[in-house]
Protein backbone atom coordinates (compact mmCIF):
# COMPACT_ATOMS: atom_id res chain seq x y z
CA UNK A 1 0.00 0.00 0.00
CA UNK A 2 1.42 3.35 -1.00
CA UNK A 3 0.32 6.87 -0.40
CA UNK A 4 -1.75 8.26 -3.20
CA UNK A 5 -3.06 11.76 -3.78
CA UNK A 6 -6.61 12.87 -4.18
CA UNK A 7 -7.89 16.13 -5.55
CA UNK A 8 -10.48 16.80 -2.91
CA UNK A 9 -12.11 19.58 -1.05
CA UNK A 10 -9.95 18.78 1.94
CA UNK A 11 -7.45 21.03 0.27
CA UNK A 12 -4.00 19.93 1.31
CA UNK A 13 -1.30 20.38 -1.35
CA UNK A 14 -1.29 17.73 -4.05
CA UNK A 15 1.50 15.30 -4.59
CA UNK A 16 3.81 15.83 -7.54
CA UNK A 17 2.23 14.41 -10.63
CA UNK A 18 4.99 12.14 -11.75
CA UNK A 19 7.36 11.78 -8.85
CA UNK A 20 5.44 11.01 -5.74
CA UNK A 21 2.44 9.19 -7.01
CA UNK A 22 2.85 5.61 -6.05
CA UNK A 23 -0.62 4.17 -6.03
CA UNK A 24 -1.31 0.82 -7.61
CA UNK A 25 -3.72 2.52 -10.00
CA UNK A 26 -1.06 4.98 -11.15
CA UNK A 27 1.50 2.23 -11.60
CA UNK A 28 -0.96 0.16 -13.57
CA UNK A 29 -1.58 3.16 -15.82
CA UNK A 30 2.17 3.68 -16.31
CA UNK A 31 2.71 0.02 -17.11
CA UNK A 32 -0.23 -0.03 -19.53
CA UNK A 33 1.12 3.03 -21.34
CA UNK A 34 4.55 1.41 -21.62
CA UNK A 35 3.00 -1.83 -22.88
CA UNK A 36 0.99 0.08 -25.49
CA UNK A 37 4.11 1.94 -26.62
CA UNK A 38 5.99 -1.34 -26.96
CA UNK A 39 3.09 -2.94 -28.85
CA UNK A 40 2.97 -0.18 -31.45
CA UNK A 41 6.77 -0.29 -31.76
CA UNK A 42 6.61 -3.99 -32.59
CA UNK A 43 3.72 -3.38 -35.02
CA UNK A 44 5.75 -0.70 -36.81
CA UNK A 45 8.82 -2.95 -37.13
CA UNK A 46 6.78 -5.93 -38.35
CA UNK A 47 4.82 -3.77 -40.79
CA UNK A 48 7.97 -2.16 -42.22
CA UNK A 49 9.49 -5.61 -42.78
CA UNK A 50 6.37 -7.36 -44.10
CA UNK A 51 5.10 -7.89 -47.66
CA UNK A 52 2.95 -4.80 -47.02
CA UNK A 53 5.93 -2.55 -46.29
CA UNK A 54 5.02 -0.28 -49.19
CA UNK A 55 1.67 0.53 -47.57
CA UNK A 56 3.56 1.60 -44.44
CA UNK A 57 5.72 4.02 -46.43
CA UNK A 58 2.68 5.27 -48.32
CA UNK A 59 0.86 5.98 -45.07
CA UNK A 60 3.75 8.01 -43.68
CA UNK A 61 4.00 10.11 -46.85
CA UNK A 62 0.26 10.71 -47.21
CA UNK A 63 -0.47 14.44 -47.20
CA UNK A 64 -3.16 15.93 -44.98
CA UNK A 65 -4.04 19.61 -45.14
CA UNK A 66 -6.58 22.33 -45.50
CA UNK A 67 -6.94 25.60 -47.35
CA UNK A 68 -8.94 28.77 -47.53
CA UNK A 69 -8.80 31.10 -50.51
CA UNK A 70 -5.29 31.17 -51.92
CA UNK A 71 -3.77 29.85 -48.72
CA UNK A 72 -3.02 26.17 -48.29
CA UNK A 73 -1.37 24.20 -45.49
CA UNK A 74 -0.53 20.52 -45.60
CA UNK A 75 1.74 18.02 -43.88
CA UNK A 76 2.58 14.37 -44.29
CA UNK A 77 1.17 11.98 -41.72
CA UNK A 78 4.64 11.56 -40.25
CA UNK A 79 5.17 15.30 -39.87
CA UNK A 80 1.65 15.71 -38.52
CA UNK A 81 2.49 13.31 -35.71
CA UNK A 82 6.06 14.53 -35.10
CA UNK A 83 5.49 18.28 -35.47
CA UNK A 84 1.87 18.73 -34.41
CA UNK A 85 0.65 15.94 -32.14
CA UNK A 86 3.97 15.68 -30.30
CA UNK A 87 3.42 19.27 -29.21
CA UNK A 88 0.99 17.85 -26.66
CA UNK A 89 3.67 15.47 -25.39
CA UNK A 90 6.07 18.36 -24.82
CA UNK A 91 3.21 20.32 -23.28
CA UNK A 92 2.75 17.61 -20.65
CA UNK A 93 6.50 17.45 -20.08
CA UNK A 94 6.55 21.22 -19.60
CA UNK A 95 3.67 21.09 -17.12
CA UNK A 96 5.43 18.42 -15.09
CA UNK A 97 8.75 20.28 -15.12
CA UNK A 98 7.04 23.49 -14.00
CA UNK A 99 5.26 21.68 -11.22
CA UNK A 100 8.30 19.85 -9.90
CA UNK A 101 10.43 23.01 -9.75
CA UNK A 102 7.60 25.10 -8.27
CA UNK A 103 5.89 22.92 -5.66
CA UNK A 104 7.17 19.39 -6.23
CA UNK A 105 10.14 17.17 -5.47
CA UNK A 106 12.74 19.54 -6.94
CA UNK A 107 11.90 22.31 -4.47
CA UNK A 108 13.75 20.34 -1.80
CA UNK A 109 17.39 20.94 -2.74
CA UNK A 110 18.85 18.36 -0.39
CA UNK A 111 16.70 15.60 -1.89
CA UNK A 112 17.06 16.78 -5.46
CA UNK A 113 20.84 17.31 -5.45
CA UNK A 114 21.94 13.76 -6.27
CA UNK A 115 19.38 12.93 -9.01
CA UNK A 116 19.79 16.40 -10.56
CA UNK A 117 23.58 16.10 -10.80
CA UNK A 118 23.26 12.48 -11.93
CA UNK A 119 20.81 13.54 -14.64
CA UNK A 120 23.18 16.26 -15.84
CA UNK A 121 25.99 13.73 -16.07
CA UNK A 122 23.57 11.37 -17.80
CA UNK A 123 23.10 14.03 -20.47
CA UNK A 124 26.74 15.05 -20.92
CA UNK A 125 28.61 11.74 -20.74
CA UNK A 126 26.48 9.95 -23.40
CA UNK A 127 27.03 12.87 -25.79
CA UNK A 128 30.80 12.66 -25.20
CA UNK A 129 30.78 8.90 -25.79
CA UNK A 130 28.78 9.39 -29.00
CA UNK A 131 31.20 12.06 -30.26
CA UNK A 132 34.11 9.71 -29.59
CA UNK A 133 32.63 7.46 -32.31
CA UNK A 134 31.51 10.36 -34.53
CA UNK A 135 33.88 13.29 -33.90
CA UNK A 136 33.11 15.22 -37.07
CA UNK A 137 30.93 15.42 -40.13
CA UNK A 138 27.16 15.16 -40.40
CA UNK A 139 27.01 12.27 -37.94
CA UNK A 140 28.38 14.45 -35.13
CA UNK A 141 25.27 16.63 -35.34
CA UNK A 142 23.19 13.68 -34.09
CA UNK A 143 24.72 13.69 -30.58
CA UNK A 144 21.33 14.69 -29.15
CA UNK A 145 19.94 11.25 -29.99
CA UNK A 146 21.69 9.72 -26.97
CA UNK A 147 20.91 12.25 -24.24
CA UNK A 148 17.34 11.39 -23.29
CA UNK A 149 15.70 8.53 -21.39
CA UNK A 150 12.20 7.30 -22.23
CA UNK A 151 10.30 7.58 -18.95
CA UNK A 152 7.39 5.39 -20.03
CA UNK A 153 9.64 2.48 -21.00
CA UNK A 154 11.82 3.06 -17.93
CA UNK A 155 8.85 2.69 -15.57
CA UNK A 156 7.57 -0.32 -17.49
CA UNK A 157 10.98 -2.01 -17.43
CA UNK A 158 11.24 -1.52 -13.69
CA UNK A 159 7.81 -3.12 -13.26
CA UNK A 160 8.83 -6.12 -15.39
CA UNK A 161 12.16 -6.69 -13.63
CA UNK A 162 10.60 -6.35 -10.15
CA UNK A 163 13.76 -5.58 -8.17
CA UNK A 164 13.68 -5.93 -4.40
CA UNK A 165 12.07 -2.88 -2.75
CA UNK A 166 11.66 -0.74 -5.92
CA UNK A 167 9.93 2.31 -4.39
CA UNK A 168 13.08 4.32 -3.63
CA UNK A 169 14.85 3.63 -6.90
CA UNK A 170 11.66 4.40 -8.82
CA UNK A 171 11.34 7.81 -7.17
CA UNK A 172 15.04 8.52 -7.81
CA UNK A 173 14.70 7.65 -11.50
CA UNK A 174 11.54 9.71 -11.95
CA UNK A 175 13.23 12.71 -10.35
CA UNK A 176 16.15 12.17 -12.69
CA UNK A 177 13.77 11.92 -15.65
CA UNK A 178 12.40 15.42 -15.02
CA UNK A 179 15.88 16.97 -15.30
CA UNK A 180 16.60 14.70 -18.26
CA UNK A 181 13.53 16.12 -20.01
CA UNK A 182 14.68 19.69 -19.34
CA UNK A 183 18.06 18.97 -20.93
CA UNK A 184 16.47 17.35 -23.97
CA UNK A 185 14.12 20.30 -24.47
CA UNK A 186 16.98 22.78 -24.25
CA UNK A 187 18.98 20.75 -26.78
CA UNK A 188 16.09 20.69 -29.25
CA UNK A 189 15.49 24.43 -28.87
CA UNK A 190 19.14 25.48 -29.19
CA UNK A 191 20.73 22.93 -31.50
CA UNK A 192 17.94 21.47 -33.62
CA UNK A 193 16.05 24.42 -35.03
CA UNK A 194 16.32 25.76 -38.58
CA UNK A 195 17.55 29.20 -39.66
CA UNK A 196 15.50 31.75 -37.74
CA UNK A 197 13.07 34.02 -39.60
CA UNK A 198 12.87 37.36 -37.79
CA UNK A 199 9.29 38.37 -38.70
CA UNK A 200 7.51 35.26 -37.38
CA UNK A 201 9.88 35.24 -34.39
CA UNK A 202 8.68 38.72 -33.40
CA UNK A 203 5.10 37.48 -33.65
CA UNK A 204 6.01 34.49 -31.48
CA UNK A 205 7.47 36.79 -28.81
CA UNK A 206 4.30 38.90 -28.85
CA UNK A 207 2.20 35.75 -28.42
CA UNK A 208 4.39 34.70 -25.48
CA UNK A 209 3.75 38.06 -23.82
CA UNK A 210 0.02 37.57 -24.33
CA UNK A 211 0.28 34.07 -22.85
CA UNK A 212 2.01 35.46 -19.77
CA UNK A 213 -0.92 37.84 -19.24
CA UNK A 214 -3.65 35.20 -19.58
CA UNK A 215 -3.37 34.29 -15.88
CA UNK A 216 -4.88 37.68 -15.04
CA UNK A 217 -8.08 37.05 -17.00
CA UNK A 218 -11.10 36.65 -14.70
CA UNK A 219 -12.68 33.96 -16.90
CA UNK A 220 -12.02 31.76 -19.98
CA UNK A 221 -8.32 31.27 -19.28
CA UNK A 222 -8.38 27.73 -20.69
CA UNK A 223 -9.70 28.74 -24.14
CA UNK A 224 -7.27 31.68 -24.19
CA UNK A 225 -4.32 29.37 -23.59
CA UNK A 226 -5.56 27.06 -26.35
CA UNK A 227 -6.02 29.80 -28.97
CA UNK A 228 -2.72 31.50 -28.18
CA UNK A 229 -0.98 28.13 -28.08
CA UNK A 230 -2.07 27.41 -31.66
CA UNK A 231 -0.92 30.89 -32.70
CA UNK A 232 2.46 30.29 -31.09
CA UNK A 233 2.82 26.93 -32.85
CA UNK A 234 2.21 28.57 -36.24
CA UNK A 235 4.60 31.44 -35.48
CA UNK A 236 7.40 29.08 -34.42
CA UNK A 237 6.79 26.87 -37.44
CA UNK A 238 7.14 29.86 -39.77
CA UNK A 239 10.13 31.18 -37.80
CA UNK A 240 12.12 27.98 -38.34
CA UNK A 241 12.06 26.94 -34.69
CA UNK A 242 10.78 23.43 -34.05
CA UNK A 243 7.07 24.04 -33.41
CA UNK A 244 6.70 21.35 -30.74
CA UNK A 245 8.47 23.76 -28.39
CA UNK A 246 5.24 25.76 -28.38
CA UNK A 247 3.90 23.10 -26.04
CA UNK A 248 6.78 23.66 -23.62
CA UNK A 249 6.48 27.45 -23.78
CA UNK A 250 2.75 27.42 -23.06
CA UNK A 251 3.24 24.95 -20.19
CA UNK A 252 5.94 27.07 -18.56
CA UNK A 253 3.62 30.10 -18.55
CA UNK A 254 0.66 28.28 -17.00
CA UNK A 255 0.51 28.98 -13.26
CA UNK A 256 0.78 26.18 -10.73
CA UNK A 257 -0.02 26.40 -7.05
CA UNK A 258 -1.03 24.29 -4.12
CA UNK A 259 -4.73 24.52 -3.23
CA UNK A 260 -5.36 27.22 -0.64
CA UNK A 261 -7.83 27.15 2.19
CA UNK A 262 -10.17 29.96 1.15
CA UNK A 263 -10.88 28.78 -2.43
CA UNK A 264 -11.41 25.23 -1.19
CA UNK A 265 -13.79 26.32 1.55
CA UNK A 266 -15.59 28.56 -0.93
CA UNK A 267 -16.08 25.51 -3.18
CA UNK A 268 -17.41 23.52 -0.22
CA UNK A 269 -19.89 26.33 0.56
CA UNK A 270 -21.06 26.38 -3.06
CA UNK A 271 -21.55 22.61 -3.07
CA UNK A 272 -23.46 22.82 0.19
CA UNK A 273 -25.72 25.54 -1.28
CA UNK A 274 -26.37 23.39 -4.36
CA UNK A 275 -27.17 20.38 -2.18
CA UNK A 276 -29.70 22.39 -0.21
CA UNK A 277 -31.24 24.04 -3.27
CA UNK A 278 -30.34 22.33 -6.57
CA UNK A 279 -30.55 24.76 -9.49
CA UNK A 280 -28.48 25.65 -12.55
CA UNK A 281 -27.06 28.84 -11.02
CA UNK A 282 -25.69 27.04 -7.97
CA UNK A 283 -24.46 24.19 -10.19
CA UNK A 284 -22.42 26.60 -12.34
CA UNK A 285 -21.08 28.38 -9.28
CA UNK A 286 -20.06 25.11 -7.61
CA UNK A 287 -18.41 23.83 -10.78
CA UNK A 288 -16.47 27.04 -11.25
CA UNK A 289 -15.37 27.10 -7.60
CA UNK A 290 -14.11 23.54 -7.82
CA UNK A 291 -12.13 24.31 -10.98
CA UNK A 292 -10.58 27.45 -9.56
CA UNK A 293 -9.48 25.72 -6.36
CA UNK A 294 -7.08 23.59 -8.43
CA UNK A 295 -4.39 25.13 -10.64
CA UNK A 296 -4.77 25.03 -14.41
CA UNK A 297 -1.53 23.06 -14.50
CA UNK A 298 -3.18 20.23 -12.54
CA UNK A 299 -6.34 20.31 -14.62
CA UNK A 300 -4.42 20.28 -17.89
CA UNK A 301 -2.32 17.30 -16.85
CA UNK A 302 -5.46 15.39 -15.93
CA UNK A 303 -7.23 16.33 -19.16
CA UNK A 304 -4.40 15.93 -21.68
CA UNK A 305 -2.17 13.33 -20.04
CA UNK A 306 -4.22 10.21 -20.90
CA UNK A 307 -4.49 11.24 -24.56
CA UNK A 308 -0.72 11.67 -24.74
CA UNK A 309 0.00 8.32 -23.06
CA UNK A 310 -2.59 6.20 -24.84
CA UNK A 311 -2.94 7.86 -28.24
CA UNK A 312 -0.16 10.26 -29.22
CA UNK A 313 2.89 8.31 -28.03
CA UNK A 314 1.69 5.00 -29.56
CA UNK A 315 1.08 6.84 -32.85
CA UNK A 316 4.55 8.35 -32.59
CA UNK A 317 6.02 4.87 -32.14
CA UNK A 318 4.01 3.60 -35.10
CA UNK A 319 5.32 6.24 -37.52
CA UNK A 320 8.93 6.34 -36.27
CA UNK A 321 9.91 2.80 -35.26
CA UNK A 322 9.31 1.17 -38.63
CA UNK A 323 12.94 0.40 -39.50
CA UNK A 324 13.91 -1.97 -42.30
CA UNK A 325 15.78 -4.86 -40.68
CA UNK A 326 16.85 -6.93 -43.67
CA UNK A 327 20.34 -8.39 -43.94
CA UNK A 328 21.79 -5.48 -45.86
CA UNK A 329 20.41 -2.86 -43.44
CA UNK A 330 21.72 -4.74 -40.43
CA UNK A 331 25.17 -5.24 -41.98
CA UNK A 332 25.32 -1.54 -42.86
CA UNK A 333 24.34 -0.64 -39.31
CA UNK A 334 26.95 -3.01 -37.84
CA UNK A 335 29.65 -1.21 -39.82
CA UNK A 336 28.29 2.26 -39.05
CA UNK A 337 29.99 4.45 -36.42
CA UNK A 338 26.65 6.24 -36.15
CA UNK A 339 24.91 3.08 -34.95
CA UNK A 340 27.69 2.17 -32.55
CA UNK A 341 27.86 5.73 -31.27
CA UNK A 342 24.15 5.61 -30.43
CA UNK A 343 24.44 2.21 -28.74
CA UNK A 344 27.54 3.15 -26.76
CA UNK A 345 26.18 6.57 -25.81
CA UNK A 346 22.92 5.20 -24.45
CA UNK A 347 24.13 1.95 -22.88
CA UNK A 348 27.59 2.92 -21.62
CA UNK A 349 27.28 6.70 -21.41
CA UNK A 350 24.08 6.72 -19.37
CA UNK A 351 25.37 4.05 -17.00
CA UNK A 352 28.75 5.68 -16.41
CA UNK A 353 27.35 9.20 -16.18
CA UNK A 354 24.54 8.51 -13.71
CA UNK A 355 26.38 5.96 -11.56
CA UNK A 356 29.62 7.93 -11.53
CA UNK A 357 27.95 11.22 -10.61
CA UNK A 358 25.99 9.53 -7.81
CA UNK A 359 29.16 7.96 -6.41
CA UNK A 360 30.98 11.30 -6.60
CA UNK A 361 28.16 13.17 -4.83
CA UNK A 362 28.18 10.64 -1.99
CA UNK A 363 31.97 10.53 -1.82
CA UNK A 364 32.28 14.31 -1.53
CA UNK A 365 29.36 14.65 0.87
CA UNK A 366 27.54 17.02 -1.48
CA UNK A 367 24.43 14.84 -1.53
CA UNK A 368 22.78 11.95 0.24
CA UNK A 369 20.60 9.10 -0.93
CA UNK A 370 17.21 8.29 0.52
CA UNK A 371 17.07 5.54 3.17
CA UNK A 372 17.39 2.09 1.63
CA UNK A 373 18.73 3.41 -1.70
CA UNK A 374 22.18 1.98 -2.42
CA UNK A 375 24.68 2.66 -5.18
CA UNK A 376 24.05 -0.85 -6.53
CA UNK A 377 20.38 -0.01 -7.02
CA UNK A 378 21.31 3.29 -8.64
CA UNK A 379 23.55 1.33 -11.02
CA UNK A 380 20.62 -0.86 -12.05
CA UNK A 381 18.45 2.18 -12.65
CA UNK A 382 21.28 3.90 -14.53
CA UNK A 383 21.53 0.91 -16.86
CA UNK A 384 17.78 1.07 -17.55
CA UNK A 385 18.14 4.79 -18.31
CA UNK A 386 19.81 3.74 -21.54
CA UNK A 387 16.32 3.02 -22.89
CA UNK A 388 16.07 6.14 -24.99
CA UNK A 389 13.11 5.84 -27.31
CA UNK A 390 10.63 8.67 -27.74
CA UNK A 391 12.87 11.75 -27.75
CA UNK A 392 15.77 9.77 -29.26
CA UNK A 393 13.68 8.82 -32.30
CA UNK A 394 12.29 12.34 -32.36
CA UNK A 395 15.79 13.84 -32.62
CA UNK A 396 16.82 11.25 -35.22
CA UNK A 397 14.18 12.71 -37.52
CA UNK A 398 15.30 16.33 -37.08
CA UNK A 399 19.07 15.88 -36.71
CA UNK A 400 19.71 13.55 -39.66
CA UNK A 401 18.47 14.29 -43.16
CA UNK A 402 19.64 11.17 -45.01
CA UNK A 403 17.09 8.35 -44.77
CA UNK A 404 19.76 5.62 -44.77
CA UNK A 405 21.60 7.19 -41.85
CA UNK A 406 18.28 7.73 -40.09
CA UNK A 407 17.68 3.98 -40.26
CA UNK A 408 21.17 3.33 -38.87
CA UNK A 409 20.47 5.64 -35.93
CA UNK A 410 17.04 4.08 -35.34
CA UNK A 411 18.55 0.60 -35.31
CA UNK A 412 21.03 1.92 -32.75
CA UNK A 413 18.22 3.30 -30.57
CA UNK A 414 16.26 0.03 -30.72
CA UNK A 415 19.36 -2.10 -30.05
CA UNK A 416 20.43 0.15 -27.19
CA UNK A 417 16.99 -0.08 -25.60
CA UNK A 418 17.12 -3.89 -25.64
CA UNK A 419 20.69 -3.99 -24.34
CA UNK A 420 19.91 -1.44 -21.62
CA UNK A 421 16.98 -3.54 -20.43
CA UNK A 422 19.11 -6.71 -20.29
CA UNK A 423 21.94 -4.80 -18.58
CA UNK A 424 19.60 -3.35 -15.96
CA UNK A 425 17.94 -6.72 -15.38
CA UNK A 426 21.34 -8.36 -14.84
CA UNK A 427 22.48 -5.72 -12.35
CA UNK A 428 19.30 -5.95 -10.29
CA UNK A 429 19.40 -9.75 -10.30
CA UNK A 430 23.08 -9.86 -9.30
CA UNK A 431 22.46 -7.26 -6.60
CA UNK A 432 19.62 -9.30 -5.14
CA UNK A 433 21.81 -12.41 -5.32
CA UNK A 434 24.74 -10.74 -3.54
CA UNK A 435 22.37 -9.35 -0.91
CA UNK A 436 19.79 -12.13 -0.50
CA UNK A 437 16.42 -10.69 0.53
CA UNK A 438 15.15 -11.59 3.96
CA UNK A 439 11.48 -12.48 4.46
CA UNK A 440 9.72 -9.26 3.57
CA UNK A 441 8.39 -7.38 6.56
CA UNK A 442 9.81 -9.71 9.21
CA UNK A 443 12.39 -7.19 10.40
CA UNK A 444 12.14 -3.43 10.71
CA UNK A 445 13.64 -2.04 7.51
CA UNK A 446 14.85 1.31 8.86
CA UNK A 447 16.31 1.51 12.37
CA UNK A 448 14.85 4.01 14.80
CA UNK A 449 16.25 7.50 14.27
CA UNK A 450 15.56 9.56 17.42
CA UNK A 451 16.39 12.83 15.66
CA UNK A 452 13.89 12.08 12.92
CA UNK A 453 11.22 9.72 14.25
CA UNK A 454 8.39 10.70 16.57
CA UNK A 455 9.37 9.05 19.85
CA UNK A 456 8.29 8.88 23.48
CA UNK A 457 10.67 7.55 26.11
CA UNK A 458 14.42 7.32 26.61
CA UNK A 459 16.50 7.00 23.44
CA UNK A 460 18.65 4.32 25.10
CA UNK A 461 15.72 2.32 26.49
CA UNK A 462 16.26 -1.47 26.33
CA UNK A 463 12.83 -2.08 24.77
CA UNK A 464 11.59 -0.50 21.53
CA UNK A 465 8.05 -0.60 20.15
CA UNK A 466 7.50 0.82 16.64
CA UNK A 467 3.98 1.32 15.34
CA UNK A 468 2.99 1.94 11.71
CA UNK A 469 -0.52 3.37 11.81
CA UNK A 470 -2.85 6.08 10.60
CA UNK A 471 -5.05 8.54 12.42
CA UNK A 472 -8.30 7.25 10.92
CA UNK A 473 -7.67 3.63 11.88
CA UNK A 474 -10.09 2.67 14.69
CA UNK A 475 -7.84 -0.19 15.78
CA UNK A 476 -4.54 1.66 16.02
CA UNK A 477 -3.07 1.12 19.42
CA UNK A 478 -2.85 4.78 20.20
CA UNK A 479 -6.59 5.17 19.53
CA UNK A 480 -7.57 2.35 21.86
CA UNK A 481 -5.28 3.46 24.66
CA UNK A 482 -3.23 0.26 24.59
CA UNK A 483 0.04 2.12 24.13
CA UNK A 484 -0.60 4.25 27.21
CA UNK A 485 -1.01 1.08 29.28
CA UNK A 486 2.15 -0.43 27.81
CA UNK A 487 4.16 2.73 28.49
CA UNK A 488 2.82 2.93 32.04
CA UNK A 489 3.87 -0.69 32.64
CA UNK A 490 7.46 -0.35 31.40
CA UNK A 491 8.15 3.28 32.25
CA UNK A 492 11.63 4.42 31.18
CA UNK A 493 12.48 0.94 29.88
CA UNK A 494 10.37 1.49 26.75
CA UNK A 495 10.93 3.70 23.71
CA UNK A 496 7.73 4.08 21.66
CA UNK A 497 7.96 5.19 18.01
CA UNK A 498 5.14 6.31 15.71
CA UNK A 499 5.46 6.10 11.92
CA UNK A 500 2.89 7.02 9.31
CA UNK A 501 1.13 4.42 7.16
CA UNK A 502 -2.04 6.03 5.75
CA UNK A 503 -4.26 3.33 4.25
CA UNK A 504 -6.23 5.57 1.93
CA UNK A 505 -8.42 2.90 0.39
CA UNK A 506 -9.91 2.15 3.80
CA UNK A 507 -9.25 5.51 5.45
CA UNK A 508 -9.60 8.29 2.84
CA UNK A 509 -8.78 11.10 5.28
CA UNK A 510 -5.75 9.46 6.86
CA UNK A 511 -3.16 11.00 4.57
CA UNK A 512 -4.40 14.53 5.13
CA UNK A 513 -4.42 13.89 8.87
CA UNK A 514 -0.82 12.66 8.71
CA UNK A 515 0.25 15.78 6.86
CA UNK A 516 -1.54 17.94 9.41
CA UNK A 517 0.32 16.18 12.22
CA UNK A 518 3.64 16.87 10.49
CA UNK A 519 2.77 20.54 10.09
CA UNK A 520 2.10 20.61 13.84
CA UNK A 521 5.38 18.76 14.43
CA UNK A 522 7.28 21.68 12.92
CA UNK A 523 6.06 23.63 15.97
CA UNK A 524 6.92 20.79 18.37
CA UNK A 525 3.25 19.81 18.73
CA UNK A 526 3.12 16.39 17.07
CA UNK A 527 1.86 14.40 20.05
CA UNK A 528 -0.69 17.05 21.00
CA UNK A 529 -2.00 17.08 17.41
CA UNK A 530 -2.00 13.27 17.28
CA UNK A 531 -4.13 13.20 20.43
CA UNK A 532 -6.65 15.58 18.84
CA UNK A 533 -6.79 13.57 15.61
CA UNK A 534 -7.36 10.27 17.41
CA UNK A 535 -10.03 11.86 19.58
CA UNK A 536 -11.92 13.07 16.48
CA UNK A 537 -11.48 10.21 14.01
CA UNK A 538 -14.95 10.71 12.56
CA UNK A 539 -14.31 14.39 11.81
CA UNK A 540 -11.12 14.68 9.79
CA UNK A 541 -12.23 17.09 7.07
CA UNK A 542 -10.01 19.95 5.92
CA UNK A 543 -11.67 22.61 8.03
CA UNK A 544 -11.42 20.39 11.12
CA UNK A 545 -7.62 20.26 10.92
CA UNK A 546 -7.29 23.94 11.77
CA UNK A 547 -9.55 23.57 14.78
CA UNK A 548 -7.47 20.66 16.06
CA UNK A 549 -4.26 22.59 15.43
CA UNK A 550 -5.55 25.39 17.66
CA UNK A 551 -6.53 22.88 20.34
CA UNK A 552 -3.04 21.34 20.12
CA UNK A 553 -1.51 24.72 20.86
CA UNK A 554 -0.26 25.52 17.36
CA UNK A 555 0.12 29.00 15.95
CA UNK A 556 -2.60 28.76 13.30
CA UNK A 557 -0.98 31.15 10.83
CA UNK A 558 2.30 29.27 11.06
CA UNK A 559 0.41 25.98 10.73
CA UNK A 560 -1.29 27.21 7.55
CA UNK A 561 2.05 28.46 6.21
CA UNK A 562 3.77 25.15 6.94
CA UNK A 563 1.03 23.15 5.24
CA UNK A 564 1.03 25.26 2.10
CA UNK A 565 4.48 26.84 1.63
CA UNK A 566 6.55 24.08 3.24
CA UNK A 567 4.35 21.33 1.86
CA UNK A 568 7.27 19.39 0.37
CA UNK A 569 8.94 19.01 3.77
CA UNK A 570 5.66 17.92 5.36
CA UNK A 571 4.92 15.64 2.42
CA UNK A 572 8.28 13.87 2.44
CA UNK A 573 8.04 13.14 6.14
CA UNK A 574 4.82 11.19 5.55
CA UNK A 575 5.81 9.53 2.27
CA UNK A 576 9.17 8.36 3.66
CA UNK A 577 7.38 6.36 6.34
CA UNK A 578 4.78 5.10 3.86
CA UNK A 579 7.46 3.95 1.39
CA UNK A 580 9.23 2.07 4.17
CA UNK A 581 5.94 0.35 4.97
CA UNK A 582 5.47 -0.56 1.31
CA UNK A 583 9.01 -1.91 1.08
CA UNK A 584 8.20 -4.22 4.00
CA UNK A 585 4.96 -5.27 2.29
CA UNK A 586 2.81 -4.05 5.17
CA UNK A 587 -0.89 -4.08 4.36
CA UNK A 588 -2.75 -3.29 7.57
CA UNK A 589 -2.80 -0.88 10.47
CA UNK A 590 -1.67 -1.06 13.09
CA UNK A 591 1.51 -3.01 12.33
CA UNK A 592 3.92 -3.17 15.25
CA UNK A 593 7.58 -4.12 15.61
CA UNK A 594 8.89 -5.31 18.97
CA UNK A 595 12.63 -4.71 19.24
CA UNK A 596 12.87 -4.66 15.46
CA UNK A 597 10.87 -7.87 14.87
CA UNK A 598 7.35 -7.75 13.47
CA UNK A 599 4.72 -8.53 16.09
CA UNK A 600 2.18 -11.13 14.98
CA UNK A 601 -0.92 -11.58 17.04
CA UNK A 602 -3.26 -9.40 19.11
CA UNK A 603 -2.20 -5.84 19.83
CA UNK A 604 -4.03 -5.30 23.10
CA UNK A 605 -1.93 -4.01 25.98
CA UNK A 606 -1.53 -7.41 27.68
CA UNK A 607 -0.31 -9.09 24.47
CA UNK A 608 2.17 -6.31 23.75
CA UNK A 609 3.50 -6.41 27.31
CA UNK A 610 4.09 -10.18 27.03
CA UNK A 611 5.88 -9.74 23.68
CA UNK A 612 8.10 -6.99 25.06
CA UNK A 613 8.88 -8.99 28.21
CA UNK A 614 9.90 -11.92 26.02
CA UNK A 615 12.15 -9.56 24.08
CA UNK A 616 13.76 -8.39 27.30
CA UNK A 617 14.84 -11.96 28.06
Swiss-Prot record:
Signal peptide residue numbers: none
Sequence segments annotated as region (Na(+)/H(+) antiporter NhaA): 1-433
Gene Ontology terms describing biological process: regulation of pH
Subcellular location: Cell membrane
GO molecular function: oxidoreductase activity; sodium:proton antiporter activity
Residues spanning the membrane: 33-53, 75-95, 113-133, 141-161, 171-191, 194-214, 234-254, 304-324, 340-360, 378-398, 411-431
CC per GO annotation: plasma membrane
Domain (Thioredoxin): residue spans on this chain: 434-617
Reactions catalysed according to its record: Na(+)(in) + 2 H(+)(out) = Na(+)(out) + 2 H(+)(in)
Keywords assigned: Antiport, Cell membrane, Ion transport, Membrane, Sodium, Sodium transport, Transmembrane, Transmembrane helix, Transport
Domain of life: Bacteria
SUPFAM superfamilies in the record: Thioredoxin-like
InterPro entries in the cross-refs: Na/H_antiporter_dom_sf (IPR023171), NhaA (IPR004670), Thioredoxin-like_fold (IPR012336), Thioredoxin-like_sf (IPR036249), Thioredoxin_domain (IPR013766)
Primary residence: membrane
Membrane topology field: Multi-pass membrane protein
Pfam family, one: Thioredoxin_4
Family listed: In the N-terminal section; belongs to the NhaA Na(+)/H(+) (TC 2.A.33) antiporter family.
Task performed by this protein: Na(+)/H(+) antiporter that extrudes sodium in exchange for external protons.
Entry protein name: Na(+)/H(+) antiporter NhaA 1
Gene that encodes it: nhaA1
